[in-house]
Amino acid sequence: DLHDYCIRHPSATYYLRASGDSMADGSLYNGDLLVVDSAEKPRHGDIVVASMQGEFTVKRLLLTPRLTLQPMNASWSPIYPDPDELDIFGVVTHIIHRPREMY
């Protein structure tokens, strides 16, 4: 069952619709459905939902050599957040992508 496959912590998991193209080279596209687990501890290399100064973003989290929110699109620049101003709202555990538009 898809629910059992995608959701490890039901009370801490939510869905989010991706918007934009900053992660397109990482196979995360505008309109994709993200499964986000707020109970998972973010690790180096995870794709996370983060907020800085009230602005939300989805990026790859790099912890070393410097805290970085790394886009996966060469047209976008990395973000080097102040750790005191960065809030991580969850780890993206699955990406649901339609290979074609459904009409």
What are these regions (language model features)?
Residues 2-103:
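Acidic/glycine-rich C-terminal interaction modules and beta/coil loop segments
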